[in-house]
Amino acid sequence: MIRSRGQALLGAMPALALIAGAGLILVALGNNAAREAHAGAQPLFWAGLALIYAPITFRLLGGGAGRGERIGLVLTLALSLYVVKVLRSPAEFVRFDELGWWRATHEAVLTGSLFESNPLNPATAGFPSLAAITAALSQLSGLSIFHSGLIVIGLARAVLALALFLLLERITGSARGAGVGIAVYACNPSFLYFDAQFGYESLALAVAAAFLLAALRWSRIEWTAVGPEVAGTAALVTALACGLAVTHHMTSLAVVGFLALWLALRTILLRRGESEEVRFKGPLLPALAIAIAFGLWFAFVAGGETLHELGGVFSRAFNSIVDLLTGSSGSKRLFSGASESQPLAARALAIVSVVPVLVLIGAGLRVLWRRRTRDSLSLALAVVALLYPVTLGLRLTQAGSETSQRASEFVFLGVAFLAALLLSGRTDRGRWLLARIGLTAVALLTFAGAFLLGELQATRQPGPYLVGAEDRSVTPQGLAAARFAAAHLPPRSRVLTDRTTATLLGSYGGMDPIFGRYADIALPRILFAPGFGHAEERAIHGQSLSFVVVDRRLGGEPPLIGYYVESDESGAFARRRAIGLGVLEKLRSVPGVSKIYSNGQIVIYDTSELTR
């Protein structure tokens, strides 16, 4: 009897989990083939993704699964796709943001301080939750920072999926619709890699989803209610608001904006007498809790870090849009890096994949209109979904692409709601089996296209070294140089080098990479000027640069992301030829500069004599 109940509860979930496991094996085989540049790497990888996503989505679309099975399927989908990200680099962190957070966590383990300055990511000093949790787990368990980070983000991914499922279920009243909503949410361009990386946004999304679920529970408590439920829910809302405020700035601001929208729509409906929500508490307490918590944290702790990061992101996006509209600059080449272009089929798929999302939004809005919906939360989520076309427009500019990418995980909450709404209350009739097959195929196309849209072709899978290609520029030579620095150079020595090497030296190497300018001299000039003169020596002295590190491979081709060191360096996004090897090796003959390390590709020069 127990066995039959368990089988009824889990349904097809164990079998689909086994199929997802087979998909992960294909992904791993594809990545291994990609590391050796073998043919068949991409077909194996994409077949693995399809084997994970399509069968689970097909089952979620059907009406035969029970609530428990749907929860299991949602968790299986979310965690299987998380493992896809882990398989991209299963031995260490290699992404830029991840290495910045590794540095922050390592400092927390060594010093016990959560607010140490971080040259790779200054925001870590203002939002220390991820570093604190990971450092605590590492110290208590004896696990490395890498493995502790994987566990923390894996748990966050599970919480995100479960909380969103419960949120959508409570809004629509349908477990079936909620499950489909999660499958649609997985189609946002950030879901597979960006929001699965070891970074504060990955953790914050889980906290935000739990907070919104608690806010929904509070909003539906009647004004006349008293007792432990009211006090407990209020305490939970407050605790989650505080937790979110100290975890991530953009997620906190997005939640503040959403709750303000929800509250405004509720107020309008109540004043018109068009809503029955008057007897419920509504979202006022959650809105005040997150606004006050983030406001205080911003004012007393993280204001500088928030303005530095978000101010730069939004100002660059705004300037890019103005330049595009005024003709000062051309539009960005879609679905490519500065020196990378995707195949025509991939570009076509990425473009076509946005069509089902637009159709879904239109269909969902039509349902809301026909039902004369007067629920303020549903209307607020619909408004969020309407921001999706706006984010697509931002991708026409170089800087706007970053803003669009970061907004997708928030906008897709509204899209997921509309998908859940469309499936809620539906009965399987007529040719629904054929319709399920067709919808699964469309969902798979959308999922694949979103990944093409959100991730550079070069970084979807591992492979041979490429210049200025984020993950693909991290190689054993760079890691060896970082290990040498950690073992033999003074900790936190000031060093100048390219972006990838700076990331490795600043994390695993324990150095302090320096960016920016000295007076009127751009620091990348030290690396890329044809010769070494008074200006370069002055910059080294003024910035107290103890070491300059040169990767000779930079002379092989232009950087894929458009720049070698910083996005505002001279020639950024406009280079058509690589920097000459002679330019990179000019420090060999500079008096007072000595070569102290070389592994054939990466050379470390001691420039401390020039700082005296």
What is each model feature region?
Residues 61-63, 223-230, 270-284, 359-386:
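Membrane-interface helix-loop-helix junctions at transmembrane boundaries of multi-pass membrane enzymes
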Residues 61-64, 71, 79-207, 410, ...:
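Active-site lumenal/periplasmic loops and adjacent helix-entry segments of GT-C-fold
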Residues 41-44, 194, 201, 253-254, ...:
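Hydrophobic/aromatic-rich transmembrane helices and adjacent perimembrane loops
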Residues 54-58, 263, 291, 347-374:
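Hydrophobic, aromatic-rich transmembrane alpha-helices
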Residues 1-85, 612:
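Start-transfer (signal-anchor) and selected internal transmembrane alpha helices
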Residues 17, 421-612:
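Extracytoplasmic
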Residues 29, 139-140, 319-348, 392:
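Juxtamembrane membrane-water interface segments that cap and precede transmembrane helices
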Residues 212, 225-228, 233-249:
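Membrane-interface alpha helices of multi-pass inner-membrane proteins
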